Structure formats: structure tokens, C-alpha cells
């Protein structure tokens, strides 16, 4: 098993009024040149957790951080106008908390939990990645406060 030191939460950047099936997600990732879905888990709007990549395999979800991380993506992240928003359903929130808890229990080491946006470069060098430095807004909520 790989050494894991980070869990990275993502959104699928899907509008709140549109569905993105696991098959759709796989098609998108294959078109980007991946061998399949880059995330290890995908959480549908109804809270269903789909294991989309074996944990033993390196993900393709956070460039420069894939080797020692697990990627979790929730369906959503855009409001009906297509703007970044926390569109997680109560079922997704519960499923995400439970999944992260299970992963922390399994790996038992010092695992950082963060959003994809938190991996943006610290452009002003003050030691904090602030909203104006985010390369993207994904996952559209404050992971450190929600989990």
C-alpha cells in the first residue's frame, strides 16, 4: 500500500441542476488523457460513494501531490448559473464526513485534509494560501472547517 499523507477534496464543477454520472466523469477524464477517473472516490448527490480508483493506485487529481494522496470528488460545485458554490446535499455532507473518518482510521498517520484550492501556490509568500491566490475555487467550501 502507498504511504498516504493527504486527502484532497474536489468538486466535479457540475451545475446544481445537472447530473454527472460516474460514466460521464470517466469519459471526461479519459478525454484529458487519464487512464480512467483520477479520483479515488466520487460522491453522488444522493450520498452514494463510488470507489472509482483503487487506493493502491496513484491518483490523477492534484498535480504534484498525487503520489501520497487520496482524491475525493463530490458531484456539484456550481450553482444553476454556473458560478462556484457549495452545492453539497446533506447526504453528500454525511457521506464525505463518514468516508474521511474511515480513511483516517485506516491510515492512522498524520494525514492532512484539504481542498484542491488549498494546494494553490502561496503567491505573496506569507505562509497562507488566501482566496485571492486560489488557482481555482474547487471544492467551493472550507474543507478544514467542514471536516
Predicted regions: what they are:
Residues 59-61:
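Short beta-strand/turn micro-motifs at beta-sheet edges
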Amino acid at each position: 500500500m502507498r504511504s498516504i499523507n493527504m486527502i484532497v477534496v474536489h468538486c466535479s464543477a457540475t451545475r446544481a441542476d445537472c447530473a454527472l454520472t460516474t460514466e460521464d466523469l470517466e469519459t471526461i477524464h479519459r478525454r484529458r488523457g487519464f487512464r480512467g477517473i483520477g479520483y479515488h472516490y466520487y460522491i453522488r448527490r444522493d450520498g452514494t460513494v463510488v470507489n472509482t480508483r483503487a487506493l493502491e493506485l496513484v491518483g490523477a487529481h492534484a498535480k504534484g501531490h498525487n503520489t501520497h494522496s487520496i482524491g475525493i470528488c463530490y458531484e456539484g460545485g456550481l450553482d444553476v448559473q454556473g458560478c462556484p458554490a457549495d452545492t453539497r446535499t446533506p447526504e453528500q455532507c454525511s457521506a464525505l464526513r463518514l468516508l474521511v473518518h474511515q480513511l483516517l482510521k485506516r491510515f492512522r498517520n498524520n494525514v492532512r485534509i484539504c481542498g484542491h484550492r488549498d494546494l494553490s501556490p502561496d503567491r505573496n509568500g506569507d505562509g497562507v494560501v488566501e482566496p485571492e491566490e486560489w488557482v481555482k475555487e474547487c471544492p467551493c467550501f472550507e474543507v478544514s472547517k467542514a471536516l
